[in-house]
Amino acid sequence: MSGTLLAFDFGTKSIGVAIGQRITGTARALPAIKAQDGTPDWNIIERLLKEWQPDEIIVGLPLNMDGTEQPLTARARKFANRIHGRFGVLVTLHDERLSTIEARSGLFEQGGYRALNKGKVDSASAVIILESYFEQGY
């Protein structure tokens, strides 16, 4: 086991991507993947899996602030199930509440409004999701 994890911040137009190491508990953003109504180019995901060979995939689970599910929750679950079904890799869903707000805030501090492009925000959110997963001791 390499201790490498790949995280996705699911969205209907863009899917953020991050790579991380369990041993260091750190993650970094990779380029976001464009999606058409939530469907990614599966060849890109396959290339990511071949390149990074993760032990586990983390998919952010969008929930309302009170913990209830929202319309995007079922779509994120379906995306996670498809990854597992297509590639046979362990996939874990992880609460992503506030990750996009935190990502936008951090990117704005670094570069103002110009830093807030959709792909950067989505991949920064994937970093936050993965680091949160590490912080919870997984």
Curated annotation (Swiss-Prot):
GO cellular component: cytosol
Entry's localization field: Cytoplasm
SMART domains, A to Z: YqgFc
Enzyme Commission (EC) number: 3.1.-.-
Any one GO molecular-function label of the UniProt entry: nuclease activity
Main location: cytoplasm
Keywords: Cytoplasm, Hydrolase, Nuclease, Ribosome biogenesis
Source organism, top-level taxon: Bacteria
Family per record: Belongs to the YqgF nuclease family.
PANTHER family: POLYNUCLEOTIDYL TRANSFERASE, RIBONUCLEASE H-LIKE SUPERFAMILY PROTEIN (PTHR33317:SF4)
HAMAP family: Nuclease_YqgF
Chain's role: Could be a nuclease involved in processing of the 5'-end of pre-16S rRNA.
The name this protein goes by in its record: Putative pre-16S rRNA nuclease
Organism field: Citrobacter koseri (strain ATCC BAA-895 / CDC 4225-83 / SGSC4696)
Gene: yqgF
